[in-house]
Swiss-Prot record:
TM region positions: 19-39
Entry keywords, A to Z: Cell membrane, Hydrolase, Membrane, Protease, Transmembrane, Transmembrane helix
Protein known as: Signal peptidase I
Cytoplasmic topological domain: 1-18
Subcellular location: Cell membrane
Ranges of the Extracellular topological domain: 40-264
Catalytic activity: Cleavage of hydrophobic, N-terminal signal or leader sequences from secreted and periplasmic proteins
Homology family: Belongs to the peptidase S26 family.
Molecular-function GO term, any one: serine-type endopeptidase activity
Annotated CDD domains: S26_SPase_I
Membrane topology: Single-pass type II membrane protein
Gene Ontology BP, a term: signal peptide processing
Length: 264
């Protein structure tokens, strides 16, 4: 074997080692520190829109099987390690107890031991209603009009919620404006979507969410588009044709938007 071949082999090994190191670092960051998520639904509209790309922090609540595991069938341990208590008003990515194969993103409203009820769309926590003020309207990209409300939780966390606006004086949806009383069990939490009329949350089928099911705390939007580009069901030609309109659909105003800054 000549010297050129030896040097070539060393170069290949060095490049492979560098590549493997980068992959390992990326995996550690994804598993332990931060993970990006894409939001496919409008249950948090207009705080979070469809096709918003969310950056979330894994370390915010410590780690559980559902935050560390890449695959649903791998069960590393029970409970959480390095657990940190979530705060009321956090936007949380979690596994819903009724379908562990998917991820939900909602706003945390009720803590363990809380008594929660909605009366005429107003949230009552332990028999005290939160501050809620109508501040205007929001018209979605689909042309649907919403009433916009500013809500403040007992810990001072402020955010906006949205209700479908009346059409010719008729309220389109009033199904979940008044609820039964919910008593949040120990170790579990109560969630609502900011889009109150179009959210499958703790008022409906979701129920309470165990702390163990928390994956990460959503922090900011790092990218956003009006349409989806990648689709496993379409061919390469259609993907190429779809690339230009996808780029044109980028929502520049939403890039690097902090999810906890209330900008009126």
């Amino acid at each position: 074997m000549n010297r050129d071949n030896i040097n070539s082999n060393k170069t290949v090994k060095q490049e492979f080692g560098s590549f493997a190191f980068v992959i390992c670092i990326a995996l550690v960051i994804r598993i332990l520190i931060m993970e990006p998520f894409t939001v496919p639904t409008g249950s948090m509209k207009a705080t979070i829109l469809e096709n918003d790309y969310i950056f979330s922090t894994k370390y915010s609540y410590g780690y559980s099987n559902y935050s560390l595991s890449f695959f649903d069938f791998i069960h590393l341990f029970k409970g959480r390690v390095f657990a940190r208590e979530p705060e009321r008003g956090d936007i949380v990515v979690f596994r819903p107890p009724n379908d562990m194969s998917v991820r939900y993103i909602k706003r945390l409203i009720g803590l363990p031991g809380d008594k929660i009820q909605l009366i005429d769309d107003v949230i009552y926590i332990n028999d005290k209603k939160i501050e809620r003020t109508e501040v205007g309207t929001y018209i979605g990209e689909d042309g649907i009009k919403y009433l916009k409300f500013k809500e403040t939780l007992p810990n001072g966390r402020t955010y906006f919620s949205y209700k479908l606006a009346p059409i010719f004086g008729v309220i389109p949806s009033d199904r979940y404006s008044n609820t039964d009383v919910f008593y949040v069990p120990e170790g579990q939490y109560f969630f609502l979507g900011d889009n109150r009329d179009r959210s499958n949350d703790s008022r409906v089928n979701l129920g309470f969410v165990p702390f163990e099911n928390f994956i990460a705390k959503a922090q900011f939007i790092w990218f956003s588009t009006k349409i989806t580009w990648w689709d496993n069901d379409i061919g390469i030609i259609n993907l190429i044709l779809k690339l230009k309109p996808w780029i044109e659909s980028v929502r520049l105003s939403r890039i690097f938007k902090n999810l906890y800054n209330v900008d009126e």
